[in-house]
Amino acid sequence: MNNNMYNAIKHHLSDNILLGYSSGSLPEAFSLMVASHISLCSTCRAQLESFDAIGGEVLNSSVETDTPMASDSLNATLALIREGPTHKPVPSRVDDRVLPRPIQDYVGGGLADVKWRAIGMGVKQAILPTSDAASARLLFIPAGAAMPDHGHQGLELTMVLQGAFKDEDDYFARGDIEMADSEMHHTPIADINEDCICLVVLDARLKFDGLIPKIMQRFAQM
């Protein structure tokens, strides 16, 4: 991906999320989101590198002063990052222009290898195999279609991989991140020019209002 792609990203990960990734404290699904985003976003990648550097200084300082570190120290959590996710996804070597390499490793290939499951109104999803602390899925929304109006019981991160969507006054294109929490109620609408594919991670179920969306939710496990 070229530098124009990097510079086009306008909606980034929060510092708290990046710090969590650097320390190894994020659930696997959220770590997948960070790894995927920084593969596209030079801004967040640089910020993460600065946090990692600070963590390295902390480690060096503790070694120099012979200060004992706790079992949940930065040293241990950084080791978790190096070890990778618990289910050990198969590395992918597919040249795919939609799925970042971290997602390809979970899919076992490129976009053509995604095992989509229809959940209603033209929307499809593919749940990715992550730990139970949070869920990760690829979501396919037809061009011009709207996701049902919903709220949140926890944190939802959505990153656009193909196409774009509009939410209130904000517009999210490839690489952009939308963060939604328990105070947010919204109805994302896919851009009419192209089908929208997103990576979505959740640490709690969504709250749908209508009867049909609630029925869909049972099948979608969202």
Model-assigned labels for residue ranges:
Residues M1-S14, E28-F30, S39-S42, A46, ...:
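Positively biased amphipathic helices and basic secretion/translocation or surface-docking motifs
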Residues M184-F208:
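Ligand-binding loop in jelly-roll beta-barrel domains
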Residues A204-M222:
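Amphipathic alpha-helical interface segments
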Residues L48, M147-D149, E168, H186-I192:
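Short beta-strand His + acidic residue motifs that chelate non-heme Fe in jelly-roll/DSBH
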Residues L19-E28:
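Short Cys/His-rich Zn2+-coordinating modules
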